[in-house]
Amino acid sequence: MQNFKPYYAVIFTSTQNINTEGYSEMAIKMETLAKKQEGFIGIDSARETVGITVSYWDSLDAIKNWKQQSEHLQAQLQGRNHWYSWYNVKICKVEREYEFNASK
């Protein structure tokens, strides 16, 4: 953990409307686009009744730039108008991390 550098996590939690036509395609497009953004570190995502996507960034500026990226702005608008019945966004600073892996 000697070389650990704190980073930021954007936690996007949501519930969807009944009509999700086009959602999966847009989610794939946004993940592909996010991976090209300066400061992007990674992403984890899961969806059942409630969906949670956590994206990781090296700075608050990188998060701000992603939020204001033109195609992402269009996706946000479509999400509010068509796909989501509710969502919540949290931005957190990750000071420490660790993991367990039984296969190692």
Task: Describe the predicted segments one by one.
Residues Y56:
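Sensory beta-strand/linker motifs that couple input domains to effectors
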Residues R80-H82:
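Acidic/histidine-enriched, beta-strand-rich ligand/metal-binding domains
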Residues M1-G51, L60-Q68, Y84-K104:
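Short S/T/G/P-rich N-terminal loop/turn motif that feeds into the first structured element of a domain
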